C-alpha cells in the first residue's frame, strides 16, 4: 500500500496553499487513467477548493452536477482483492487524515441515486502521525493505493476517497474535505458482510475530536489521533 506519509515534514504553522482534487483512478495494472474517466467530476475541478459542510448533500461525492455527472462517468471493472487507487492532481499537501469508503450502487454505479442510504463502509485509512507533540506528514505524495477487500460481494459500487485537511481545523467548519468518487464494477467477489454501515452525509457532525482539532496546540494527555467515522472493514 502507498501511504501519503512517506516523506515527512513537521507542521509548525498553518498552510494556506495546496488545494487539490482526485481526478484519476489507478487501475489494478498500475495504469493511471485520464482525468474524470472513472471518477465523477467534482465541482472544484477548477478551483481545487474543499468541502467544509459535512451536512451538505454535496459532501457525498461533490459532483459537478449530480443528475448528469454520474451518467457521464465510466465504470471501471475490477476484481475483489485487486489493488487500486486514486491520484491527486497535485501533492496531497495539507496535513490530515485520509480514508476510503465504498457503497453498493443501486440501481447502478452511474446512477445519481447510488450511495444515498446507510450503505457506506470504510476499507482503508491513513492516520496522521505525531512526534513530540507535532504532526508529521508527506508533502509530496500524489498517489494512494489500497486493496479492494477479497470477501466483498460482486456488484457495482461507489468508491470514495476523502482527505480531511486539519491545518485550520481548530474551529467548527475549519476542517477541509477533499473528496472523489469512482464508479466500480466488482467481479470475482466473496460472501462477506461489509460494515459498520454509515450514511454520507450523516457520518460526521463536524464536532468529532478528529475533525475539530488544533494540531498546533495538542493537550498534554494527547495519546494519538482519533479517526472519525466507522472502523475499517477487514473483509
Curated annotation (Swiss-Prot):
<dbReference type="InterPro" id="IPR049892">
    <property type="entry name" value="AA9"/>
</dbReference>
<keyword id="KW-0503">Monooxygenase</keyword>
<comment type="similarity">
    <text>Belongs to the polysaccharide monooxygenase AA9 family.</text>
</comment>
<feature type="binding site">
    <location>
        <position position="178"/>
    </location>
    <ligand>
        <name>Cu(2+)</name>
    </ligand>
</feature>
<feature type="binding site">
    <location>
        <position position="167"/>
    </location>
    <ligand>
        <name>O2</name>
    </ligand>
</feature>
<feature type="binding site">
    <location>
        <position position="19"/>
    </location>
    <ligand>
        <name>Cu(2+)</name>
    </ligand>
</feature>
<dbReference type="GO" id="GO:0030245">
    <property type="term" value="P:cellulose catabolic process"/>
</dbReference>
<dbReference type="GO" id="GO:0005576">
    <property type="term" value="C:extracellular region"/>
</dbReference>
<protein>
    <recommendedName>
        <fullName>AA9 family lytic polysaccharide monooxygenase D</fullName>
        <ecNumber>1.14.99.56</ecNumber>
    </recommendedName>
</protein>
<keyword id="KW-0136">Cellulose degradation</keyword>
<keyword id="KW-0560">Oxidoreductase</keyword>
<keyword id="KW-0624">Polysaccharide degradation</keyword>
<feature type="signal peptide">
    <location>
        <begin position="1"/>
        <end position="18"/>
    </location>
</feature>
<feature type="disulfide bond">
    <location>
        <begin position="61"/>
        <end position="181"/>
    </location>
</feature>
<dbReference type="GO" id="GO:0046872">
    <property type="term" value="F:metal ion binding"/>
</dbReference>
<keyword id="KW-0186">Copper</keyword>
<feature type="glycosylation site" description="O-linked (Man...) serine">
    <location>
        <position position="29"/>
    </location>
</feature>
<feature type="binding site">
    <location>
        <position position="176"/>
    </location>
    <ligand>
        <name>O2</name>
    </ligand>
</feature>
<feature type="glycosylation site" description="N-linked (GlcNAc...) asparagine">
    <location>
        <position position="221"/>
    </location>
</feature>
<keyword id="KW-0732">Signal</keyword>
<keyword id="KW-1015">Disulfide bond</keyword>
<keyword id="KW-0119">Carbohydrate metabolism</keyword>
<keyword id="KW-0325">Glycoprotein</keyword>
<dbReference type="GO" id="GO:0004497">
    <property type="term" value="F:monooxygenase activity"/>
</dbReference>
<dbReference type="InterPro" id="IPR005103">
    <property type="entry name" value="AA9_LPMO"/>
</dbReference>
<comment type="function">
    <text>Lytic polysaccharide monooxygenase (LPMO) that depolymerizes crystalline and amorphous polysaccharides via the oxidation of scissile alpha- or beta-(1-4)-glycosidic bonds, yielding only C1 oxidation products. Catalysis by LPMOs requires the reduction of the active-site copper from Cu(II) to Cu(I) by a reducing agent and H(2)O(2) or O(2) as a cosubstrate.</text>
</comment>
<keyword id="KW-0964">Secreted</keyword>
<feature type="binding site">
    <location>
        <position position="94"/>
    </location>
    <ligand>
        <name>Cu(2+)</name>
    </ligand>
</feature>
<keyword id="KW-0479">Metal-binding</keyword>
<dbReference type="Pfam" id="PF03443">
    <property type="entry name" value="AA9"/>
</dbReference>
Amino acid at each position: 500500500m502507498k501511504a501519503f506519509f512517506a516523506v515527512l515534514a513537521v507542521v509548525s504553522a498553518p498552510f494556506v496553499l495546496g488545494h487539490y482534487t482526485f481526478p484519476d483512478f489507478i487501475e489494478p495494472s498500475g495504469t493511471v487513467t485520464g482525468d474524470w474517466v472513472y471518477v465523477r467530476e467534482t465541482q472544484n475541478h477548477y478551483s481545487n477548493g474543499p468541502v467544509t459542510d459535512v451536512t451538505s448533500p454535496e459532501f457525498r461525492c461533490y459532483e459537478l452536477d449530480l443528475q448528469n455527472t454520474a451518467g457521464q462517468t465510466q465504470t471501471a471493472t475490477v476484481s475483489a482483492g485487486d489493488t487500486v487507487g486514486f491520484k491527486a492532481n497535485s501533492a496531497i499537501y495539507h496535513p490530515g487524515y485520509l480514508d476510503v469508503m465504498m457503497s453498493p450502487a443501486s440501481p447502478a454505479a452511474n446512477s445519481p441515486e447510488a450511495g444515498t442510504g446507510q450503505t457506506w463502509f470504510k476499507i482503508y485509512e491513513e492516520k496522521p502521525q505525531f512526534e513530540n507533540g507535532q504532526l508529521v506528514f508527506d508533502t509530496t505524495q500524489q498517489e494512494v493505493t489500497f486493496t479492494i477487500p477479497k470477501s466483498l460481494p460482486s456488484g457495482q459500487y461507489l468508491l470514495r476517497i476523502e482527505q480531511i485537511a486539519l491545518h485550520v481545523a481548530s474551529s467548527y467548519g475549519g476542517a477541509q474535505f477533499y473528496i472523489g468518487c469512482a464508479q466500480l464494477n466488482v467481479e470475482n467477489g466473496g460472501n462477506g458482510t461489509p460494515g459498520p454501515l454509515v450514511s454520507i452525509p450523516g457520518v460526521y457532525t463536524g464536532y468529532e475530536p478528529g475533525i475539530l482539532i488544533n494540531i498546533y496546540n495538542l493537550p498534554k494527555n494527547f495519546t494519538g489521533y482519533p479517526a472519525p467515522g466507522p472502523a475499517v472493514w477487514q473483509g
